Amino acid sequence: MSFFLRLAALLLLHTSIAQASHCPDWSTKQARTEVAQLRATLANWDDHYHRQGIALVADELYDQARHHLLHLQQCFGQEFTDPSPLASARGPIAHPVAHTGVEKLHDAAAVARWMTGKKGVWVQPKVDGVAVSLVYRQGRLVQLLSRGDGLQGHDWSRHIKDLDSITRQLPQPLDVVLQGELYLRLQAHVQAEAGSSNVRGTVAGMLARKQLGPEPGASIGLFVWDWPHGPDNQGERLTQLAAWGFPDSQRFSTAIDTPEEATHWRLHWYRSPLPFATDGVILRQDSRPPADRWQPNAPYWIAAWKYPFAQALAEVREVRFLIGRTGKVTPLLRLKPVTLDDRRISQVSLGSLARWRALDIRPGDQVAISLAGLTIPRFDQVVHRAVERQVLPVPEAEQYGQHSCWQASDGCQEQFIARLVWLSGKQGLAMPGTGKGTWKRLVQAGLVTSLTDWLTLDAQQLLSVPGISRKTATQLQRSFDIGRNRPFAQWRKGLGVPAPAQVPRDENWQTLAGRSASDWQTLPGIGATRATQLANFFTHEQVQRIATLLGTRGIDGFHGTDDVGSQ
């Protein structure tokens, strides 16, 4: 995508972006520092891509980062500066015909407005590759130029001999200039399923080499998208291109009359197997000015309608560390909400504390998010780091485990509440209306500090808790009665006994707690590790105390646990 296209699109969008997005609560000094850091990040990406042929981020993440830069500049009254991403791409060789940009259309309504009053409109896939000029002399391909800044590019003619998949000799000895896209050849590539996988960067990297080589060269194809000096009619241009050995230009181009047809073909190519990756569709009009008047900006006769983002750039607002029932610490990134495939995403899990430590993500960082299986938010990478690194209260993983936090003591509230949620959930006692919010209120009110305290709560105590009405108190008492009368098998599961499902139903707590590790290992499906876990569970002091209390409350299966607890 050209600098001029990006600049036009970004300047068009910056007002609406700023209105839709909240500005960071930064001092003037911090704003200046953070904006400078983002500019430096973008400049580094530009240099790697255009000069070294290395794409450090996906194109859509790059665009979103530039949007974010303009938003920050407006937030803090800074002058709009968008240094050309092609600053290091300009080459020494002038193009015979300038490469234009394309106007970017963001939705079906914008497509309809663009098509209003236009005749002879065609649609074709927007091939995701590297733009080039091809110069034929007497029918032979003699020059291959990188797009550069649209006016001047680098000479890639040294690679012509290795590009076996490209027509290097026309049927007639003609002098012709073509413009097109060098792409990575793929087999039955479905964009909606596979995405682009950085194929553009792969091709750019190969072409940046001093020598390409036959094997890499054979993996590169060409999609010709313009013949600047060709006939006025697009259909005639495509027919002649096919006769010269460029059939894909005709095969993947369709004349349309309505925005609905544009929508149809965009969706069709998005979900159909193609020989190349794409990132949208191109709309072009038959009528255009003479080639000598073309400029490297977005003209009126070409527009792009890109596909939905496969990755979204999201700002981290908060890093939370969730502690589950078993003591596992899971970092959770709270995000400034973004939309992917019509899904609003405001948080994503990092999976493990070790992963967070390796990534060191802090509030203010920009991260890439995608959807796993088209539904589950997935963290992909850190895209940009904030200059200011906030200090976070990070839990020590060693403090938590299977036998920690059986009570609501300091530093234990979260794991303890998770134990209560599990106990009362469908996998345990199946007590209606006792979710995390209810238990949190009771714990914070000091009414529930152990796993058995709820068994003795009365209506008056429940009504003293903020947020619990008389109706809710009555419902909770009914739910507590249900839990109290559940059979032992459900209590066993709710307390988290690490026993397999095939433990005999008629066994009680005293029988289970009386087994040694070697006794457990004689049962089907229990190995040495599980046997040790079971023995440790039943001999844990806190677990024994809970069992004793349940026995005194008359809970099924816990009679006689006083003796077990004193062993």
Curated annotation (Swiss-Prot):
InterPro entries in the record: DNA_ligase_B (IPR020923), DNA_ligase_CS (IPR033136), DNAligase_adenylation (IPR013839), DNAligase_N (IPR013840), NA-bd_OB-fold (IPR012340), NAD_dep_DNA_ligaseB (IPR050326), NAD_DNA_ligase_OB (IPR004150), RuvA_2-like (IPR010994)
GO biological process, one term: DNA repair
A molecular function (GO) term: DNA ligase (NAD+) activity
Keyword Signal applies: no
UniProt KW keywords: DNA damage, DNA repair, DNA replication, Ligase, NAD
Enzyme class label: ligase
SMART domains for this protein: LIGANc
Active site: K126
A Pfam family: DNA_ligase_OB
EC number from the UniProt entry: 6.5.1.2
Transmembrane segments: none
Superkingdom per UniProt: Bacteria
Catalytic activity as recorded in UniProt: NAD(+) + (deoxyribonucleotide)n-3'-hydroxyl + 5'-phospho-(deoxyribonucleotide)m = (deoxyribonucleotide)n+m + AMP + beta-nicotinamide D-nucleotide
The family this protein is said to belong to: Belongs to the NAD-dependent DNA ligase family. LigB subfamily.
Function per UniProt: Catalyzes the formation of phosphodiester linkages between 5'-phosphoryl and 3'-hydroxyl groups in double-stranded DNA using NAD as a coenzyme and as the energy source for the reaction.
Protein's recorded name: DNA ligase B
Organism: Pseudomonas putida (strain W619)
Gene: ligB
